Amino acid sequence: MQTWSSPSVPKLRGAPRPLRLHDTATGEVRPTAPGDTARLYVCGITPYDATHLGHAATYLAFDLVQRVWLDNGHDVHYVQNVTDVDDPLLERAARDQDDWVVLAMRETALFREDMEALRVLAPREYVGAVESIPGIVDMIEKLLASGAAYRLDDDEYPDVYFPHDATPNFGYESNYDRETMLRLFAERGGDPDRPGKRDPLDALLWRMARPGEPSWETSIGTGRPGWHIECSHIALANLDTPFDLQGGGSDLVFPHHEYSAAHAEALTGQHPFARHYAHAGMIGLDGEKMSKSRGNLVFVSKLRSTGVDPGVIRLALFAGHYREDRPWTDELFAEAGTRLALWRSAADLESGPSVDDVVARVREHLGNDLDTPKALAALDAWAREAWDRGGPDTEAPGVFRTAVDALLGIAL
């Protein structure tokens, strides 16, 4: 699948700071410690609607991860999937009397446009679930052969399931108790009440064909893959395990990331799936999480169509810490526009106060669990001083501009 074009990332003078990031599995902020090549997997969209600000917040958070790693001299091998066949996509296509393939292609194309406009660094591999079906089937065959998968005793729909206890470490990523798992499993695409399962928490690997649904003829039967096995396969096919970081929104902690890891670990026998699990908070509107199901969405494409500078969107979302659930408000949006104007005015000055200490502080803040509020405050202070009092350093405005571009992805 075609990815989008990445902006260039300028080289910044001075000493970088290594990235320490909150790990969901341990509950600690700890070093990411990649090797020469940092390996990142972030779960992509289910393309049945346009990119909203909740999506943008997640992908911008992991864009910062890439930028800090690049600043530290790492190559970054970034993989992202597209869930281009799944129940929400099929349901939306049926509701709107649309062809599900056309809908998926249209929304995936719009997502790429939005990411490019937001100056998000593109993944090296951008992989759809549909194109991955042969590899997914091979993975399920191996899980069946090893006893880490089973078929339902159902003459009509003998679906294939993954026993949640197939690995000894199930639950290590989310650290949830069974009651919480059951609740979230039911809320987030699971089927705890499916008759014939060995346990309510067992997860679907292969759904046998139903009337009116897309399906593929394979060695394990005609059907389509479950959600979690798609990411397991795509990550295993493109990244050595354990890779450095598995990322996504906080609504993916369970069940998606827990099962993706369990599927892969059951196949390979290698634990953990990823060395680090990081999750971005939700963006709210009118007191509710912004989501397609609720319909309380602010779309990136709609903002762009009204002439909103993508830098304003980035700054508005960076005003809060990436792990926090936070609201989108008109005040936040206005403050971001004011901030961008201040920074651009300061970057256009012929000289200013020394900027190296400020850049060092920005690096320190971003290296400490992507603390963007403190990073933005440090840059604000320099820009105000430069505008109000000036300074003798003729290189400072240019270095300021470079730092904002390299570390925050904002073109001044």
UniProtKB/Swiss-Prot annotation:
Q: Tell me the SUPFAM superfamilies matching this sequence.
A: Nucleotidylyl transferase
Coiled-coil region(s): none
Catalytic activity, reaction form: 1D-myo-inositol 2-amino-2-deoxy-alpha-D-glucopyranoside + L-cysteine + ATP = 1D-myo-inositol 2-(L-cysteinylamino)-2-deoxy-alpha-D-glucopyranoside + AMP + diphosphate + H(+)
**What keywords were assigned to this record?**
ATP-binding, Ligase, Metal-binding, Nucleotide-binding, Zinc
Enumerate the InterPro entries for this protein.
Cys-tRNA/MSH_ligase, Mycothiol_ligase_MshC, Rossmann-like_a/b/a_fold, tRNA-synt_1_cat_dom
Q: Name one GO cellular component term.
A: cytosol
Segments carrying motif 'ERGGDP' region? 187-192
Provide the GO MF annotations for this entry: ATP binding; cysteine-glucosaminylinositol ligase activity; cysteine-tRNA ligase activity; zinc ion binding
Q: Which PANTHER family match?
A: CYSTEINE--TRNA LIGASE, CYTOPLASMIC, CYSTEINYL-TRNA SYNTHETASE
Q: Which family does the entry's similarity section mention?
A: Belongs to the class-I aminoacyl-tRNA synthetase family. MshC subfamily.
Q: What does this protein do?
A: Catalyzes the ATP-dependent condensation of GlcN-Ins and L-cysteine to form L-Cys-GlcN-Ins.
Q: Which HAMAP family match?
A: MshC
Q: What is this protein called?
A: L-cysteine:1D-myo-inositol 2-amino-2-deoxy-alpha-D-glucopyranoside ligase
- What organism is listed for this UniProt entry? Actinosynnema mirum (strain ATCC 29888 / DSM 43827 / JCM 3225 / NBRC 14064 / NCIMB 13271 / NRRL B-12336 / IMRU 3971 / 101)
What would be the name of the gene that encodes this protein?
A: mshC
